[in-house]
């Protein structure tokens, strides 16, 4: 298995393309100059395209991924109705979802042969919209609205329109600020990192109709932490055994173990990392975690070790200015 790591640096308007080997070493393949401040990125389900959100001219860009080394070639673009904060796709590669924090909306762009061709739907009134997350069955889009302390739930229609479910939302605790999410591989649980109080909520998917319930909330900060809380990103290993979340003020990655059924998290430890970690990701083998330091202008590679999933640093690498996003592609 070959793996490529992509890092987005908006301040220098660059994407760095790296080859990741089996020992956790990165080798630079390409530096792409992007026409705008590049932030959120996602790889298409068929692993042939990288979709990128840019500002201040709000667009989604599509880059073809070379099958031999992961290098990028620009392919297409499509306008967006707001500044892109988060980008994702459905599991069949038919639609791109873009959440916009500043505009307070989530948009759906149709894909044709892997390329963005037209805006299909826009849902407004999502104050502080921070991500858009399709359920493993490809039926429901979960949209955390940070400023409204809620997660909005939409059914994805065959033509890409979003229809509010009943109930249309679930509330988080006051002052939480739901931000990013991941789903457990067993499809029965989801985990949401809350930006404002640096906690993680465990949500149970109760039935196929989209009903969900919060079954656990866990503080992700050390007991003696007294500064402003500012959580950012969350990811789970492919086997569902280990979960990680980061806080930017503390420049810390919190390590969680996940119970066998996915319902219970336990804090295993804390890993100091690059300054102001805005984004990170886990490779497809579940062996390495790559974190980006928005203030250090570096990325760091960690090996995931032992039954607790603790992190051991393998190396750090200079990237562009203000790196914010990391994605990994395997082929």
Swiss-Prot record:
EC category: hydrolase
Entry function: Catalyzes the hydrolysis of 6-phosphogluconolactone to 6-phosphogluconate.
Enzyme Commission number: 3.1.1.31
Family listed: Belongs to the cycloisomerase 2 family.
Protein's name in the database: 6-phosphogluconolactonase
Superkingdom of the source species: Bacteria
HAMAP family in the cross-refs: 6P_gluconolactonase
Pfam (any one): Lactonase
Swiss-Prot/TrEMBL GO biological process terms: glucose metabolic process; pentose-phosphate shunt, oxidative branch
Xref: PANTHER family: 6-PHOSPHOGLUCONOLACTONASE, 6-PHOSPHOGLUCONOLACTONASE-RELATED
Entry keyword Methyltransferase: no
Assigned keywords, A-Z: Carbohydrate metabolism, Glucose metabolism, Hydrolase
Example of a GO MF term: 6-phosphogluconolactonase activity
Reaction(s) catalysed by this chain's protein: 6-phospho-D-glucono-1,5-lactone + H2O = 6-phospho-D-gluconate + H(+)
Pathway assignment: Carbohydrate degradation; pentose phosphate pathway; D-ribulose 5-phosphate from D-glucose 6-phosphate (oxidative stage): step 2/3
SUPFAM superfamilies: Nitrous oxide reductase, N-terminal domain
UniProt keyword Hydrolase present: yes
GO annotation, cellular component aspect: cytosol
NCBIfam families tied to this protein: PRK11028.1
Organism: Salmonella paratyphi A (strain AKU_12601)
């Amino acid at each position: 298995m070959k793996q490529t790591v992509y890092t987005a640096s908006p301040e220098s308007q660059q994407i760095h393309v790296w080859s990741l080997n089996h020992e956790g070493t990165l080798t630079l393949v390409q530096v792409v100059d992007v026409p705008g401040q590049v932030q959120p990125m996602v790889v298409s389900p068929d692993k042939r395209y990288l979709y990128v959100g840019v500002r201040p001219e709000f667009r989604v860009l599509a880059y073809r991924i070379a099958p031999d080394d992961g290098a990028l070639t620009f392919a297409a673009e499509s306008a967006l109705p707001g500044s892109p904060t988060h980008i994702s796709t459905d599991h069949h590669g038919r639609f791109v979802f873009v959440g916009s924090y500043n505009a307070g909306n989530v948009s759906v762009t149709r894909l044709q042969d892997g390329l963005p061709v037209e805006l299909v739907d826009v849902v407004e009134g999502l104050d502080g919209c921070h991500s858009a997350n399709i359920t493993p069955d490809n039926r429901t889009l979960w949209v955390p609205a940070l400023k409204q302390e809620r997660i909005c739930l939409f059914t994805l229609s065959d033509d890409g329109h979003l229809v509010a479910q009943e109930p249309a939302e679930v509330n988080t605790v006051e002052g939480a600020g739901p931000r990013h999410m991941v789903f457990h591989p067993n499809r029965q649980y989801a985990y949401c990192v809350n930006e404002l109080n640096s906690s993680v909520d465990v949500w149970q998917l109760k039935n196929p109709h989209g009903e969900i319930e919060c079954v656990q909330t866990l503080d992700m900060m050390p007991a003696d932490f007294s500064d402003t809380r500012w959580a950012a990103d969350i990811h789970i290993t492919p086997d569902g055994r280990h979960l990680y979340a980061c806080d930017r003020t503390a420049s810390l990655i919190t390590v969680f173990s996940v119970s066998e059924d996915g319902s219970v998290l336990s804090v295993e430890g804390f890993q100091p990392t690059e300054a102001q970690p805005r984004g990170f990701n886990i490779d497809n083998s579940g062996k390495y975690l790559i974190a980006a330091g928005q203030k250090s202008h570096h990325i760091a590679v960690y090996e995931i070790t032992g039954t607790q999933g603790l992190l051991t640093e393998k190396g750090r690498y200079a990237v562009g200015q203000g790196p914010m996003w990391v994605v990994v592609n395997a082929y």
